[in-house]
Amino acid sequence: MVIATQIKECLAAADYGMVLTINDFGIEPRYHATLVKALNRKVAIGELQKVSKGKYYKPKKTVFGSLSPAPSEIVKDLLEKNGKTVGYITGTAAFASMGLTTQITSAIMVGTNRYRRPITRGESKISFLVQPNSITEENIPLLRTLDAIKLIREIPATSPDDSTVVLGKIISALTKERLQQLCQLAEAYKPSVRALLGAILENNNQPTFGLEITLNGVTTYKLPISKNVLPNKHNWNIL
């Protein structure tokens, strides 16, 4: 009876789409098996939906069906641990929010400091992108910009040319201090990312903060970006 009451109170306080774990219900560990059975009964009648083992959410129902949780809810345990930021959403979902694509996807990419194998939670396939820089709330927008440059061939429903134009606008809107931070973070990325970032900065009349010095002067980079979009690309050995 106590378990049923705590479940009812917890669900009443939870927003639609908020992912709840077993620990969120405040039930002693020795009663977790009973709790899981009670939650699974609610899944069976449609009151709850299951994301993965031990993870549930209260679905918001519309005329088109139940809405899935936001990507940040599905992977929130991968984004923060003990109050510290340990990951961030990148890839198509993040690029859409940046105006780089209109593609909608259930796939989620998480930037993290260590390699992890892809996993599946409900209908969402989760992949991981190793991020060599430290991850903080402050630098996440910059890391996403660098990820977009790194993955420029893979951004869906657009072209590398169009993505380069949008990235130019995003980067040009940064303050000089943030531009310098962007270039510092870029030093941990592969040379082709630094070359393309440098070309975008130069083409938009922005300082490059010595990015050219970090590159091998005889190495060339094959990137599918036209001279119409980056007329200065040969300055950065981009073919």
Map each language-model feature to its residues:
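Short beta-edge/loop segments at beta->alpha junctions of small alpha/beta modules
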Residues: 2-80
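Short coil/turn segments at secondary-structure boundaries
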Residues: 22-23, 107, 161
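Amphipathic alpha-helical interface surfaces
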Residues: 35, 90-91, 141
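Short, intrinsically disordered, mixed-charge
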Residues: 41-44, 94-96, 100, 151
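Short gly/ser-rich loop at a beta-strand->alpha-helix junction or flexible surface loop bordering the NTP-binding
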Residues: 51-54, 83-121
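Short, surface-exposed loop/turn motifs that are enriched in glycine and acidic residues
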Residues: 64-65, 80-84, 131-138
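A short, charged helix-loop
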Residues: 119-130, 137
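Hydrophobic alpha-helical interaction segments
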Residues: 135-239
